[in-house]
Amino acid sequence: MLKQLRALAWRCAPDLCEAISVRLPALRAYRRYGWRRRAVGRATTAAVPIVVAGFHGAVLGLGEAARGLVSALASTGTAVRAWDVSERLGHARRLDLGDTTAPAAGPGVMIAHMNPPELIQLIATDPMPFEGKRVIGYWAWELARVPSLWKPAFRYVDEIWVPSRFTAEAIRRAAPRRLAVRVAPHPVPVSRTAPDRGRFGLDPDHVIVLSAFDLRSTLARKNPLAALEAFRSAVARTRRPATLVFKTVGGAEAPAALASLLTAIGDARDVMLIDQPLSVADRDCLLASCDILLSLHRSEGFGLLLAEAMAAGKAVVATGWSGNLDYMGDRTAVLVPYTLISVDDPQGVYRGGRWAQADVEAAGSALADLIDDDAHREAMGRRAQEAVGAQLATPVIATLMRRFLDGETAPLSR
């Protein structure tokens, strides 16, 4: 109930909620630490310990990304510690991953794998773990301009890493020139998980189309209603039977968004909704059990699930705009044409600017072709897997991150 009331307050009085949840913590953070913080110079080699603060124990895309960063650095022999701040920042700790004990003050590197509002809240609560450390903010954003409320966080970081060029450009527009903004994509290992349709009640004779998203990341941005419309357009012209699976989380925190999705689905027998957290193993199994991933998102900072689907050898149909273009091309995915429209987000998370409206008819036509043509679908999946393996494999990204920590630069850095 408390989470639902909080969501209602954000919809009805976003400016007041911003003042309470972001501006007041920013003042507390400055009073406790910001006024005396000094930038920590880059060393020729990264100081130890290296701490990755993030939502390691939470069932969130941000948590998955933080866990991937830790695994990537550890694979290079780097001594790295995962500090789980999930419960400190209001998220349930559902996975026994990461250490909940705050690190001590003193030399080292702190990679804060959370966006500025959460970083400010964490520092306002307890600045000691950041004392004396080189702080790298790992941030992601889905629009062409970052919120003005992010600006106070720039004083607390010595460098910024981002998952895509799209996010890099958004942050560079707002960041002081002293701050390097480096593109360090999420590592995406090639999946070896075996499919098991019986585990989820999926028809073995159907082509399975998956659309998965967090309702807290807003229904407007993830745009599943357009995905549903495209699927209905596709199955009206296909010869093969197909099922659309919506895998969601966050329905309890975004009940109005969940209700809208349920209303749109209605009593359709070829659409399934799974609205519950899955273990990492179950989530990977669900992805392995599908044939096509469909994402008519209006914007993505990176699109981790899209990259994971490609790594699993799945055909992907996705809006051809924003962060996913870093690793998607016409031969490795279906890039759906779009028009840019003004942002309209009833959940109040995204305000101002423009984002993409995918061409639903074009998406439906492409989806129908993939449903009916096994050879076409499988060939695209193989090309996608090869491309992601070459560009986003853990050793590739781990080496890049290690270079950044050791003081080297890259072409995509400022």
Which residues fall in each region the model found?
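Conserved donor-binding/catalytic core segment of Leloir-type glycosyltransferases
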Residues: 51, 202-222, 228-232, 244-245
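A short, well-ordered alpha-helix in the C-terminal region of glycosyltransferases
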Residues: 362-369, 376-390
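C-terminal alpha-helical cap of glycosyltransferases
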Residues: 394-414
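Extended catalytic core of nucleotide-activated donor transferases of GT-like folds
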Residues: 51-53, 71, 81-172, 282
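Nucleotide-activated donor-binding/catalytic signature segment of Leloir-type glycosyltransferases, i.e.
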Residues: 255-284
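N-terminal pre-catalytic "stem/leader" segment of glycosyltransferase-like enzymes
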Residues: 2-114
